[in-house]
């Protein structure tokens, strides 16, 4: 099968007409057979999509025809099967939800650090290195020496910073995330909170894995991604993890040997905390998935748990 191109993209840019952009953007995706979810807000665009080489190229040609998006960048990886079930364009208040009024990367942002320069920065003992992703993402891979805030959503990040760090004592802060969007917005928040030197990894972990040879890498483990691959290895090939549809946690090969693992319904992370209502919903969803597989069709029901991660 011809490789499917998976493109992760975002750009903070003022889009006053973002509501009007939704329909032509959605039509461009549909016309070119591109699947996935894109988020539009006044502060910019964010998402991960997949399709043929021609389809992805057509999408970016359309995006870059808008002068505001002419320099939009993206990261690419490849897989043999379509990793998304649907095509969506959603309107949001924020393209990545921090929930703090006034934080605007279009006005204030930290210093971008290229992948080739990242190792030198985070090896500096005076630099505080923070992983801005969710706890279940950090659990399967992170940079050597990084702090895990143990947050379940990006909304919890500001309170974590307030509770643990002081701008007067922590002079240099470096942050990273999967594709660059969280840490870029986090850098805007940190500067507003009084931190003086704030750095973030340009292009995120995915760009680092793409550009830095594994033998020189300070990355440890797999990287969680927002599609049906669940994780990628250092060479950006698909990892060994699955994802629990009930709790969204990545599920390792070892986890899948557990008596508490029931495909699509529960895993060792959530088996003792699910309500019967949640279990019943998961059972019905899994039933529909199996029926769709038997018919060789995409799964038609329920939202993909990976899609919601874009917003958290």
Curated annotation (Swiss-Prot):
Keywords: Oxidoreductase, tRNA processing. The keyword Oxidoreductase applies. GO terms for molecular function: oxidoreductase activity, acting on paired donors, with incorporation or reduction of molecular oxygen. Residues 282-293 have a biased composition (Basic and acidic residues). Residues 123-217 form the Rhodanese domain. The keyword tRNA processing applies. It comes from the Bacteria. Belongs to the TrhO family. Catalyzes oxygen-dependent 5-hydroxyuridine (ho5U) modification at position 34 in tRNAs. This is tRNA uridine(34) hydroxylase. It comes from Pseudomonas aeruginosa (strain ATCC 15692 / DSM 22644 / CIP 104116 / JCM 14847 / LMG 12228 / 1C / PRS 101 / PAO1). The gene is trhO.
């Amino acid at each position: 099968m011809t490789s499917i191109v998976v493109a992760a993209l975002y750009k903070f840019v003022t889009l006053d007409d973002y509501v009007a952009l939704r329909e032509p953007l959605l039509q461009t995706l549909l016309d070119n057979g591109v699947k996935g979810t894109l988020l539009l807000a006044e502060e910019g665009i964010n998402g991960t999509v997949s399709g043929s080489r021609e389809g992805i190229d057509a999408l970016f040609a359309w995006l870059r025809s808008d002068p505001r998006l002419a320099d939009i960048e993206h990261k690419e990886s490849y897989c043999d099967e379509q990793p998304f079930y649907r095509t969506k364009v959603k309107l949001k208040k924020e393209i990545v939800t921090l929930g703090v009024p006034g934080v605007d990367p279009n006005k204030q942002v930290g210093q971008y650090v290229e992948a080739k320069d990242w190792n030198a920065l985070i090896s500096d003992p005076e630099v505080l290195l923070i992983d801005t992703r969710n706890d279940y993402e950090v659990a399967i891979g992170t940079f050597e020496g990084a702090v895990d805030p143990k947050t379940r959503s990006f909304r919890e990040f500001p309170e974590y910073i307030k509770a643990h760090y002081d701008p007067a004592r922590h002079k240099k802060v470096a942050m990273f995330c999967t594709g660059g969007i969280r840490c870029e917005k986090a850098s805007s928040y940190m500067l507003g909170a009084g931190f003086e030197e704030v750095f973030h990894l340009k292009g995120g972990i995915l760009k680092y894995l793409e550009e830095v040879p594994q033998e020189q890498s300070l990355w440890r483990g797999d990287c969680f991604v927002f599609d049906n691959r669940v994780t990628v290895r250092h060479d950006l090939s698909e990892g060994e993890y699955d994802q629990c549809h009930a709790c969204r946690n990545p599920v390792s090969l070892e986890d899948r040997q557990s008596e508490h693992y029931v495909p699509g319904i529960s895993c060792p992370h959530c088996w003792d905390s699910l309500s019967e209502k949640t279990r019943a919903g998961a059972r019905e969803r899994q039933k529909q998935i199996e029926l769709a597989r038997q018919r060789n069709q995409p799964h038609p029901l329920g939202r993909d748990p990976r899609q919601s991660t874009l917003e958290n």
